[in-house]
């Protein structure tokens, strides 16, 4: 188990020791959660550390952490922006037509549209040396793929968060995907 997962498990056990038998949650569920956390730590710990270092370097150098996503995944953008006690230099890149509240069918169509990422990110104030976090459940739609390429071409450090398990089983919809 990685260091972060071990600390989480220790804190959990400390809190659990204060509970009565009636209050204890189902062990099977919690065991699965900790197994998943340990697996994520083992498989992605180095990548998560590299992403954190990149964001720190951007902010420490006077830059920003840009955060972008489409569909349901846009919620990570909202979670990272303007939170009490959170990071201040976060630039949320939110486009109404790529979010569900204006219509799920329209949003789905728009996130598959070539050129849409450049249109949205072109107005976002991206600068070389900054870091951008792009979140996508599957990683297969055109806009997130084009957004990563657009940012990389402009000298940003690109951090992508997706489900590898899902994205490996689906064909990309992005014409330029490699």
Predicted regions located by residue number:
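Short, Lys/Arg-enriched N-terminal segments with co-localized hydrophobic residues
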Residues: 3-18
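Generic N-terminal amphipathic, Lys/Arg-enriched alpha-helix
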Residues: 19-42
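Short, contiguous, pocket-lining structural segments
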Residues: 25, 47-50, 72
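Short amphipathic alpha-helical segments enriched in leucine
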Residues: 34, 38-41, 56, 60, ...
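Short, surface-exposed connector motifs at secondary-structure boundaries
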Residues: 36, 58-64, 128-132
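A short, well-structured juxtamembrane/interface segment
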Residues: 43-60, 120
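Glycine-rich phosphate-binding loops that contact phosphosugars or nucleotide phosphates
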Residues: 54, 67-178
């Amino acid at each position: 188990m990685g260091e972060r997962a071990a600390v989480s498990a220790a804190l959990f056990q400390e809190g659990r020791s204060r509970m009565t038998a009636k209050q204890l949650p189902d062990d099977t569920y919690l065991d699965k959660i900790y197994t998943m956390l340990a697996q994520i730590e083992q498989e992605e710990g180095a990548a998560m550390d590299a992403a954190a270092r990149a964001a720190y370097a951007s902010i420490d150098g006077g830059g920003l952490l840009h955060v972008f996503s489409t569909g349901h995944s846009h919620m990570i953008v909202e979670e990272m922006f303007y939170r009490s006690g959170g990071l201040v230099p976060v630039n949320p890149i939110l486009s109404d037509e790529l979010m569900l509240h204006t219509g799920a069918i329209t949003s789905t169509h728009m996130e598959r549209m070539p050129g849409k990422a450049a249109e949205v990110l072109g107005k976002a104030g991206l600068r070389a040396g900054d870091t951008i976090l792009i979140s996508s459940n599957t990683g297969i739609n055109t806009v997130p793929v084009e957004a990563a390429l657009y940012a990389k071409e402009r000298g940003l450090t690109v951090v992508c968060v997706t489900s590898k398990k899902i994205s490996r089983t689906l064909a990309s919809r992005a014409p330029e995907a490699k």
